[in-house]
Amino acid sequence: MTKIGKKIRIERIINRESRNTVIVPMDHGVSMGPIEGLKNLAETVNAVAEGGANAVVLHKGVVGFGHRGYGKDVGLIIHLSASTSLAPDPNEKVLVCTVEEAIKLGADAVSVHVNVGSKTEAYQLRKLGEISKIAGEWGMPLLAMMYPRGDGINQFDEKAVALAARVGAELGADIIKTNFTGDVESFRRVVDGCPVPVVVAGGPKMGSDEDILRMVRMAMDAGARGVAIGRNIFQANNPTKMTRAISMIVHDNADVSEALEFLKS
């Protein structure tokens, strides 16, 4: 029963034809406050849904504000982890929601954030293991946001990223979100070393639209199964068109020039 349940839910957060996904995380309100692009969640969810996003990531308290109730459906991933930028250690992620709560709120998947190499790594790994067990029992897909972060750690280093991704898979995640390592070859080794699908994180707002589209193209060429991009989508001049441009690369194998031409049209 749980196997078919998980299959059904996963198909709500991916494209059934390409088997890839465009996820738009909108969980930044806890860590960063009401930043640009997230002041009106309903408006932003609508914009990315119209652009073809497969799923959004929200915290439990704002699910109602992000529910469309009309038009194209968009998958719901409820984020279970949190920390704020004002904390003594923002890398210390704690659980603020349960799998059962997420199910009651209508989630299609849950996500957990782990900072590998942080001072509280042990706690975060233990909680990831616990959540993967519970999620598995309920047939709930688990997205693990795995980042190498801590004193003296280069969070874009290939070996560090590969380790973080592999840890998430080893502890039971169904999909891994992690940093791009800067080029196709190194990220391909990250993907090849992870036995579950990898989606690339967008990170901080980039300098240009072309920069983000180029990163997406390189990640897909390396074998990524999609993206989980927040600020570079919802803080774009036109979030709907940016979502569509990224979707063209992820689902239709468009090149950067094609996606950029659409974005500028």
Swiss-Prot record:
InterPro entries: ADH_synthase, Aldolase_TIM, DeoC/FbaB/LacD_aldolase, DeoC/FbaB_aldolase, FbaB-like. CDD domains: DhnA. Keywords: Amino-acid biosynthesis, Aromatic amino acid biosynthesis, Schiff base, Transferase. 1-deoxy-D-threo-hexo-2,5-diulose 6-phosphate binds at residues 27-31, 147-149, 202-203, 230-231. One of its GO terms (molecular function) is hydro-lyase activity. One of its GO terms (biological process) is amino acid biosynthetic process. SMART domains: DeoC (SM01133). The active site is at 27 (proton acceptor), 147 (proton donor), 177 (schiff-base intermediate with substrate). Its EC number is 2.2.1.10. The keyword Heme does not apply. It catalyses: 1-deoxy-D-threo-hexo-2,5-diulose 6-phosphate + L-aspartate 4-semialdehyde = 2,3-dioxopropyl phosphate + 2-amino-2,3,7-trideoxy-D-lyxo-hept-6-ulosonate. Disulfide bonds: none annotated. It holds the Pfam family DeoC. Catalyzes a transaldol reaction between 6-deoxy-5-ketofructose 1-phosphate (DKFP) and L-aspartate semialdehyde (ASA) with an elimination of hydroxypyruvaldehyde phosphate to yield 2-amino-3,7-dideoxy-D-threo-hept-6-ulosonate (ADH). Plays a key role in an alternative pathway of the biosynthesis of 3-dehydroquinate (DHQ), which is involved in the canonical pathway for the biosynthesis of aromatic amino acids. Belongs to the DeoC/FbaB aldolase family. ADHS subfamily. Homodecamer. PANTHER family: 3-HYDROXY-5-PHOSPHONOOXYPENTANE-2,4-DIONE THIOLASE (PTHR47916:SF1), FRUCTOSE-BISPHOSPHATE ALDOLASE CLASS 1 (PTHR47916). This is Putative 2-amino-3,7-dideoxy-D-threo-hept-6-ulosonate synthase 2. It comes from Archaeoglobus fulgidus (strain ATCC 49558 / DSM 4304 / JCM 9628 / NBRC 100126 / VC-16).
